[in-house]
């Protein structure tokens, strides 16, 4: 199964359980490096504790095994999204307007595939990004974005 569709399948399967624990499923990532891994990111308004990550790992891990959602050996990781969180859905970004983000595109825009800048706004079509090296912000459509993450600025 393709990694993107496996991540979606796992997301749909585990989200009700995670929500029943008072948490939010931030996203699911599937990697196939040296050892295949399923990484589940959870969040809440007050952040998440190590104990909450462990509880989700136990409960969700057991469910994934019993229901045989994944048909090969894998490592399960449960984590908070962290300070430099990846964005999995466009609607996650609206809470970070005014913050710096890092974006990688599927294909080039203005001769580049990577952008860093200040997120100025989001809407149903895409986002507006103010780059440090340009006066005018650029509009990037959601379907052009391959990866996006928050850049945490220490003060």
Swiss-Prot record:
<dbReference type="InterPro" id="IPR028989">
    <property type="entry name" value="RimP_N"/>
</dbReference>
<dbReference type="InterPro" id="IPR003728">
    <property type="entry name" value="Ribosome_maturation_RimP"/>
</dbReference>
<dbReference type="Pfam" id="PF17384">
    <property type="entry name" value="DUF150_C"/>
</dbReference>
<dbReference type="InterPro" id="IPR028998">
    <property type="entry name" value="RimP_C"/>
</dbReference>
<dbReference type="Pfam" id="PF02576">
    <property type="entry name" value="RimP_N"/>
</dbReference>
<keyword id="KW-0963">Cytoplasm</keyword>
<protein>
    <recommendedName>
        <fullName>Ribosome maturation factor RimP</fullName>
    </recommendedName>
</protein>
<dbReference type="GO" id="GO:0006412">
    <property type="term" value="P:translation"/>
</dbReference>
<comment type="function">
    <text>Required for maturation of 30S ribosomal subunits.</text>
</comment>
<dbReference type="GO" id="GO:0000028">
    <property type="term" value="P:ribosomal small subunit assembly"/>
</dbReference>
<dbReference type="InterPro" id="IPR036847">
    <property type="entry name" value="RimP_C_sf"/>
</dbReference>
<comment type="similarity">
    <text>Belongs to the RimP family.</text>
</comment>
<dbReference type="InterPro" id="IPR035956">
    <property type="entry name" value="RimP_N_sf"/>
</dbReference>
<dbReference type="GO" id="GO:0005829">
    <property type="term" value="C:cytosol"/>
</dbReference>
<keyword id="KW-0690">Ribosome biogenesis</keyword>
